[in-house]
Amino acid sequence: LSRNNNVYLGLDGFQRDKTEDSKISLNIASLFATPSGEEVLSYLRSITIEQVNGAGVSDAELRHMEGQRYIVGLLESRIRHAHRVKNDE
């Protein structure tokens, strides 16, 4: 999160209203707080962040995998952000 010259950048690096950014995080946290949501997030993590590529991986494959990892990491960051938002209320 960054706040420069009254510009609020969300976790994803996009400029938006701070309230809207918090709402996005709260919605994501709510979605993944269910038992099914927790299982889905665990599955996504297992096939992205926890996946190890061998030395023979191509540049294109690696870029594809890193994009997937970024999205799952962003979801997890949004969940942590939502917990901070709730604690600040």
Predicted regions, residues:
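Intrinsic-disorder/low-complexity detector
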Residues: 1-89
